[in-house]
Regions:
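Hydrophobic/aromatic-enriched cytosolic interaction surfaces used to assemble or bind macromolecules
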Residues: 1-190
């Protein structure tokens, strides 16, 4: 049995059924090496992407603060963008890469608004992927895009049976896999 599709399609399938995906939604999937962006409005209407991901954030912090990669990763996932004593330095380190993602997201949104016939007003931004595991990233996107944004959390809507859910800090990584697991059996090729 086989199913091949772009990862953003699997993400969209999951979010459409669990995260108010019936609303016109911007999906920002921040993977380790790249970010995929999609507009979901009944189906995927527009996509975009760039070669900046969670690993880029870690490298940015390590370079800017002159610390080892392991320490940079810890600062990223523990402190991130939320208020605190170290945040100014972290925000300054992360800002250039985050700004590139914001600009590409705005470009995709603008294309949807200007070129897609019958489009509806975009209602929300859902951030997924391992790179979404940064405290304060939802608020950062909300402020930058002037639209409600948050890290997607579809887990409460999924039936794991006897399997244990992934640990909270790893959940954003499994969004694509969970979306693939939601493929109706009739769509699979034997």
């Amino acid at each position: 049995v086989c199913m091949i599709e772009p990862s953003i399609s699997a993400v969209a399938r999951l979010l459409e059924s669990t995260e108010k995906g019936h609303l016109p939604t911007v999906i920002v999937d921040i993977g380790p090496a790249s970010t995929d962006i999609a507009i979901l409005d009944g189906s995927i209407r527009v996509t975009g992407g760039l070669s900046i991901g969670g690993n880029t954030f870690t490298l940015d912090i390590a370079k800017k603060l002159h610390i080892p990669l392991e320490n940079a990763h810890q600062l990223k996932v523990i402190n991130g963008l939320s208020p605190g004593s170290r945040q100014q330095k972290l925000v300054k380190a992360l800002s250039p890469s985050l700004e590139h993602i914001i600009k590409e997201t705005q470009k995709v949104m603008r294309y949807y608004d200007e070129r897609v016939d019958g489009h509806r007003k975009l209602e929300q931004v859902l951030i997924v992927g391992g790179g979404a595991n940064i405290p304060g990233i939802g608020e950062h996107f909300t402020n930058a895009l002037v639209m409600p944004a948050r890290v997607a959390s579809p887990w409460q809507h999924l039936n794991f049976g006897t399997l244990q859910q992934p640990a909270k800090q790893f959940r954003p990584r499994y969004i694509t896999v969970a979306g693939l697991a939601c493929v109706p059996p009739k769509e699979l090729v034997a």
